[in-house]
Structure formats: C-alpha cells, structure tokens
C-alpha cells in the first residue's frame, strides 16, 4: 500500500462502521472518547497522537518491511561511521581496523540476505511504498555486499527499477561501476575509489573526457567535487598524466583482493 495513500484513507477510516478498524486503533479511539467524556485534556493530548501510528501498523502491509529496513540501514551506516573514524585516527585507532572491517563484512552478509529476500518477494520497492530511507537501503546493501555474482544478478533489476521510478539513477551508476571494478574493468561514472598504500585512487575511467557529463546525467556532482571528499582532486588533464600509475595501482588492488 502506498505511503501517501495511507494519509488519505486514515481520515476516511474514521467514518467506517464499528469493527472495521483493527483492535489497537479501536482501543485508542475508545480511550480518546473516555478522555473527552471526562474532560481530561492532558490524557487526551497524550493519546490521540498515537492513533495514526497504530492505524498504519495495522493497515500498511509494508510496515514490518520498513521497520526491518530501518534496522538494516542503521547497522550498515553505523559500522561505517566507526570505520571512517578509525581511518581518520589511524595512529591511535588503527589497531581496531582489521576487526572492525571483519565485523562490517559480517554485517553486510547478514544485511544483503534480508534485503534480497525482500526484493525477491516484493520487487524493488519505491519511495512511495516504503519511504526514501528504506528505498535507499535496498541499494546500499546490494552495493556493499562482497558477492560479485549477486551484484551482477541485481544490476538489471535496479536498472528496471530506475526506469519505473522506484530507484535513483545514481544507484544504478554506483552499482554499475562496482560490478565493473570487481570484474577488472574501467568504471563509467567515476563512483569507485580504492586505497593503496594509504592513498586514494580512482578506479580507472572508461571515458575520462566525458565522465562529468555522464555523472550529470545520473544526478551526480562533478567528479572533482566528489574526489575532494577523499582529500583528492580531479581534472581530465591530471588524470591522463597519472593514468598509467592509476592503472598500475588498480592491478595491484585487484591482485591483493584476489580478483
């Protein structure tokens, strides 16, 4: 059931016959009436705001899915916040790097099982179905998993979801580049970076001259802006000068990751 539609049917439901609404919402309504009858404004103000959430829980079939994806999202992002802090403080926190990376790998494996189960049952649910955060979580878990075959399997599914308005074009761009990177191919949209010997490198680009145009087409910022987030910069001229080194570092990275 569409989330926007829930807001409309909630008010219509107030006019339904007794018993048409589920038990918890019904109970809350009865409490509201009792509070009004007893002129207990304080109690009423505490109770009536609970009605909408109770109604949604009982009538939106996607509610359990949304709640599950919220937990998945928080696990996915929280462990990465911790990992990012370690990278920023390697001298003091570097000893935790290997264990946190292993924990993250385990989390990603667990999360992708949940997410692929949801996608296989419901299809790629859009924002109107489950909200923006849950929708993005579907993409994040496919993107972050270490299973290249699984990512390749879901690439055409997310492409179709983009065409149906159920996923963002940049989701497809990121996953496309990830699949190509893992296959040892140059990336298209410039979304993937690697770290070799403590330095961040772009994965080699298929078409550096047109990369910003391609990024613009999927709603991504210019590549130089993106790379500044890693403490690096990008220009076509700089890239072409360093291209042979970039390719060497990529080969080194592929070898170290058994690809």
Regions flagged by a language model, labelled:
Residues 186-196, 216, 231-234:
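Compositional signal for N-terminal targeting/processing segments
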Residues 1-28:
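Bacterial Sec-dependent N-terminal signal peptides
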Residues 116-182, 186-192:
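Mature extracellular/secreted ectodomains of secretory-pathway proteins
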Residues 24-133, 145-148:
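Preference for long, solvent-exposed alpha-helical segments and helix-linker "stalks"
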Residues 98-100, 194-203:
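Extended, non-catalytic structural segments that build the interaction scaffolds
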Residues 28, 111-114, 154, 207-214:
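Stable alpha-helical elements in mature extracytoplasmic
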Residues 203, 210-259:
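A cross-kingdom marker for long, charged
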Residues 3, 18, 124-125, 167-168, ...:
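Intrinsically disordered or highly flexible coil/loop and linker segments, enriched in small
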């Amino acid at each position: 059931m569409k989330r926007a539609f829930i807001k409309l049917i909630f008010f219509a439901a107030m006019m339904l016959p007794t018993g048409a609404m589920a038990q918890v919402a019904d109970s809350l309504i009865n409490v509201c009436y009792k509070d009004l009858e007893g002129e207990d404004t304080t109690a009423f103000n505490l109770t009536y705001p609970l009605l909408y959430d109770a109604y949604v829980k009982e009538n939106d079939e996607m509610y359990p899915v949304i709640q599950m994806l919220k937990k998945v999202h928080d696990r996915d992002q929280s462990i990465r916040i911790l990992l990012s802090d370690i990278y920023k403080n390697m001298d003091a926190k570097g000893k935790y790097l290997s264990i946190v990376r292993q924990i993250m790998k385990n989390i990603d494996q667990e999360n992708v099982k949940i997410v692929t189960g949801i996608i296989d049952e419901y299809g790629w649910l859009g924002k109107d179905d489950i909200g923006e955060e849950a929708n993005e979580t579907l993409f994040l878990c496919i993107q972050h998993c270490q299973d290249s075959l699984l990512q390749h399997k879901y690439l055409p599914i997310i492409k179709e979801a983009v065409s149906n308005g159920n996923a963002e074009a940049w989701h497809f761009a990121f996953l496309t580049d990830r699949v190509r990177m893992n296959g040892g191919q140059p990336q298209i949209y410039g979304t993937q970076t690697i770290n070799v010997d403590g330095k961040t490198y772009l994965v080699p680009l298929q078409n550096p001259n047109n990369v910003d145009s391609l990024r613009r087409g999927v709603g991504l910022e210019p590549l130089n802006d993106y790379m500044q987030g890693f403490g690096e910069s990008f220009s076509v001229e700089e890239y072409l000068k360093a291209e042979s080194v970039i390719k060497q570092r990529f080969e080194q990275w592929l070898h170290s990751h058994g690809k």
